[in-house]
A protein has these predicted regions:
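Lipid interaction determinants
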Residues: 19-86, 99-151
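Beta-propeller blade signature
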Residues: 90-92
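Bacterial Sec-dependent N-terminal signal peptides
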Residues: 1-31
Length: 151
């Protein structure tokens, strides 16, 4: 009986470590932490593709558990149409599936909703593709954004 306890414990320890290694290896290749500046973005609704990012600056800040984004007009008008946009919350990352759980946003229709993206990092470039669907705001489109790491 004593001879089977040690091998059994060893097998259980190896199994536990293997599970942990599998969980971490799925995201080991992706390094999202940092400050990212939006370079290009587009939305696709049906057959309509609308590029954006030319008239404003946007950054996304990601740490181990949270994300935030900040956006403002490049050339702000002198009247009340000056626009600033911000949001943030927690995120999860499983393999290349990045899900933002939007806890704070200037348009409350978006709050409390998860948005899942497929992410890819190439050097200092982050590309995220996903679907934004917010019934209350009449939003249902594919979104593709390309960011570059701010140094």
């Amino acid at each position: 009986m004593k001879n089977t306890i040690a091998p059994t414990c060893l097998v259980l320890i190896i199994a536990c470590l293997s599970c942990c290694a599998c969980t971490q290896s799925g995201t080991a290749g992706l390094h999202l932490n940092g400050t990212w500046q939006l370079v290009t973005g587009m939305t696709i609704t049906g057959k309509d593709t609308v590029p954006y990012a030319g008239d404003f600056r946007m950054i996304k800040i990601i740490n181990d558990t949270h994300f935030a984004f900040l956006r403002h007009d490049k050339n702000p008008p002198k009247d009340s149409s000056n626009h600033f946009d911000a949001g943030g919350g927690i995120y999860t990352l499983s393999g290349n599936q990045y899900t933002e759980h939007l806890d704070y946003y200037s348009d409350r229709n978006w709050e409390g909703k998860p948005f899942t993206f497929t992410v890819e990092v190439r050097g200092d470039t982050l590309i995220q593709t996903g679907i934004e669907k917010v019934d209350a705001a009449h939003i249902d489109h594919i979104i593709i954004e390309k960011y570059v790491m701010v140094r």
